Amino acid sequence: MTPSYWNTDYVHAISNDGGRSMMGSRQENWFYNQLSASAKRGATWRIVGSQTVFSRLNESVAYGNVNPLDYDAWDGYQSNRNRTLSHLYDNGISNNVFISGDSHASWVSDVAWLDNKAYNPATGDGSIGVEFAGSAVSSPCPYGANITMALAHNATQWLVAANSELQWNDLYYRGYYELHISAEQVEARYFGFPTIVFRNTYEISLANFTIKSGANKLTRPVGGGVVESGTLKSGKTVQTNLTVDTANGTYFISHYDLEVL
């Protein structure tokens, strides 16, 4: 059962029920076996695709204190997430990269078993991997279809402060990210569209993140210490509006953030 707006209280009440499984028992056990098999055969990385955000996210700034989590994501299947984390930690399975979406926002986190394993958000020590969650290409921001950059930034400040493992969040830009994978590292490059009001080929580089092989955490300083938009834990946001027209490679300064998107 998943939230359908009218039943969120009930789904919240059963969100930590041991019988709930995001994948179902058969696929869940297959998943754990594949994680172990990948590590045993010496694969460098475990790239785990998830439709919804894996990390725990306190979003009471939007949802309120009664039901503060997104119970349509892994926060609605907490025992299943705990079993996944237990399998990774207990078996020493490292180099885990979760890639996810569905939330219409960008989130970058260390993957940590909060309340069970010690985790230091400043250094990333205690993490067992990272998560890169992407925004929507055109669907609206969950915090308001016509949200301004200022309001989006205020919300991201709250979210990053309230969630220890969350290292960066952007709510304003529609966009995508790329993964660049080598044996030594995985780099995630986030891009945003300055406007979706009309068809165009414009994009802005929002942030870049790296995980080194064997580190199991985002490389510090996270994002190189500076991002274009959103909030970066222990970093700063510098808005340049430097935009590239991907059709011809030319750069210009856009100001579409002043428009209602």
Residue locations for each model-derived region?
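Metal-dependent phosphoester/phosphodiester hydrolase catalytic core
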Residues: 1-261
